[in-house]
Amino acid sequence: MRSYTLLALAGPLAVSAASGSGHSTRYWDCCKPSCSWSGKAAVNAPALTCDKNDNPISNTNAVNGCEGGGSAYACTNYSPWAVNDELAYGFAATKISGGSEASWCCACYALTFTTGPVKGKKMIVQSTNTGGDLGDNHFDLMMPGGGVGIFDGCTSEFGKALGGAQYGGISSRSECDSYPELLKDGCHWRFDWFENADNPDFTFEQVQCPKALLDISGCKRDDDSSFPAFKGDTSASKPQPSSSAKKTTSAAAAAQPQKTKDSAPVVQKSSTKPAAQPEPTKPADKPQTDKPVATKPAATKPAQPVNKPKTTQKVRGTKTRGSCPAKTDATAKASVVPAYYQCGGSKSAYPNGNLACATGSKCVKQNEYYSQCVPN
């Protein structure tokens, strides 16, 4: 059920923030997201997409890679990652009661999980896709290894099918090892921070989009500042989308046509997606029912904390950010830091030298600027 909270604005207009309770599923179909087409909502630019080599595409009319001969796919850095033990960031395909793409494309929502092993944890997601086969207040979370669902753009993007069931994806963390390098981190996230939760329920509220998500998608709603800022802890270990995020920021600005802030929501393109499926799935392709294809350069993506594997069935897709093992200085004098906190560093940056990780975790390089303690 969805409710609305009226927020007073400085101007004459008021914007209602969506909130309520909902259900999640998972997917990763590699398809171009629906919100990557122009004219879906009043935004500065459509969500970014990438070619099969994970390079940002500037042509918002590029054909969906899930269609024959298509060249636009979801960028691998649309993979989820842990901000700290209790908060994660990511992207999703959505269908919100009483809304439409004009109201949810590129909008951000703070989810608080209410069931399963992640009960009590929070995740902020940006909606980059629309689920034509989803029910009301249904969020199809993008996570590599979650299953491709109705559409499969991964086979054409990577030259081979990704492992796992069409709905639900893989069932063990070790299966992530067979995935393309750029998808492994996001795949591991599912079994680590997300604890292999199987389609947990949640409560949600619309919030301002975190810069880290905007840097990846390159898409910001004109009314984003009208919504409340997330009040939870976002500091702990902030593995912001590494180079990929930075790359996307500039890529987003240069690659996508900008819209004026005053532009009203544009009419959405007619959808050409197939019908619903056996499990909550994700829409795939063109306007209205395309899959979220976050456009962000692949290169480097915020690495996800690696935790303990779990088994589960999910709904869709697969992709992820790449990660590089960080070097740890065995002779570092710095005091040890807990899992998911920043580690490594040099004497010039830290008075005590290299920051070592606590027993049971190792220092993993997320990008050229940041390393994080990840459980063994």
Swiss-Prot record:
Q: Mind listing the GO molecular function terms for this protein?
A: cellulase activity; cellulose binding
Q: Where is this region: Linker?
A: 309-338
* Span list, region Catalytic: 19-308
Lipid metabolism: is it a keyword of this entry? no
Q: From start to end residue, where is composition biased (Low complexity)?
A: 235-258, 291-306
Which InterPro entries does the entry mention?
CBD_sf, Cellulose-bd_dom_fun, GH45_Enzymes, Glyco_hydro_45, RlpA-like_sf
Name its GO BP terms in alphabetical order.
Answer: cellulose catabolic process
Q: Which reaction does it catalyse?
A: Endohydrolysis of (1->4)-beta-D-glucosidic linkages in cellulose, lichenin and cereal beta-D-glucans
Positions of the UniProt region annotated as Disordered? 229-332
Q: Looking at the keywords, is Hydrolase present? A: yes
The CBM1 domain, residue ranges: 335-374
Q: Which UniProt keywords apply?
A: Carbohydrate metabolism, Cellulose degradation, Glycosidase, Hydrolase, Polysaccharide degradation, Signal
Write down the EC number: 3.2.1.4
Residues annotated as catalytic:
D29 (nucleophile), D140 (proton donor)
Q: Which residues form the signal peptide?
A: 1-18
* First-tier enzyme category under EC: hydrolase
SMART domains, from UniProt? fCBD
An annotated GO cellular component: extracellular region
Q: Hey, which family's this protein in?
A: Belongs to the glycosyl hydrolase 45 (cellulase K) family.
Q: Which PANTHER family does the UniProt record give?
A: ENDOGLUCANASE 1 (PTHR39730:SF1)
The protein in question is named: Putative endoglucanase type K
Q: What is the lineage of its organism?
A: Eukaryota, Fungi, Dikarya, Ascomycota, Pezizomycotina
